[in-house]
Swiss-Prot record:
Located at the top of the head of the 30S subunit, it contacts several helices of the 16S rRNA. In the 70S ribosome it contacts the 23S rRNA (bridge B1a) and protein L5 of the 50S subunit (bridge B1b), connecting the 2 subunits; these bridges are implicated in subunit movement. Contacts the tRNAs in the A and P-sites. Belongs to the universal ribosomal protein uS13 family. This is Small ribosomal subunit protein uS13. Residues 92-121 are annotated as: Disordered. Signal peptide: none annotated. One of its GO terms (cellular component) is small ribosomal subunit. GO terms for molecular function: rRNA binding; structural constituent of ribosome; tRNA binding. It comes from Petrotoga mobilis (strain DSM 10674 / SJ95). Part of the 30S ribosomal subunit. Forms a loose heterodimer with protein S19. Forms two bridges to the 50S subunit in the 70S ribosome. Gene3D superfamilies: 1.10.8.50, 30s ribosomal protein s13, domain 2. Keywords: Ribonucleoprotein, Ribosomal protein, RNA-binding, rRNA-binding, tRNA-binding.
Length: 121
């Protein structure tokens, strides 16, 4: 397996799919990166030369926020929303949906498992 930015990219998959294993890179971004570097997107990771791997790593590192850096920025943004006391921050803190979804009957993923009530006889 080729190692790009600390992430194992699978050898048996097309390179544009393999790059999506890196947090912050989707298919479109992967194709853009490969087109900029003039690397065949359907090439397998095991067929990459050391030079191509270093070019990929350098290009991604210079032009994109990925992995830990991206996660830190997202967490920092959420913390900022909580600190300023915005509605979105309060929803994050309470563990409820942030983007206006209804919560009366749904939102189980965000709210967690149901708390069962003890029935009176």
């Amino acid at each position: 397996m080729a190692r790009i930015l600390g992430v194992e990219v699978p050898d048996n998959k097309a390179l544009f799919v393999g790059l999506t294993y890196i947090y912050g890179i989707g298919r479109k971004t992967a194709l853009d990166i490969l087109n900029n570097l003039e690397i065949d997107p359907n090439k397998r990771a095991k067929e990459l030369t050391d030079d191509e791997i270093s070019r990929l790593s350098h290009h991604i590192n210079e032009n994109y926020k990925v992995e830990g850096e991206l996660r830190q920025e997202i967490n920092k943004n959420i913390k900022r929303l909580i600190d300023i006391g915005s509605y979105r921050g309060k929803r994050h803190k309470a563990g409820l949906p942030v983007r206006g979804q209804k919560t009366h009957s749904n939102a189980r993923t965000r709210k967690g498992p149901r708390l069962t009530k003890i029935k009176k006889r």
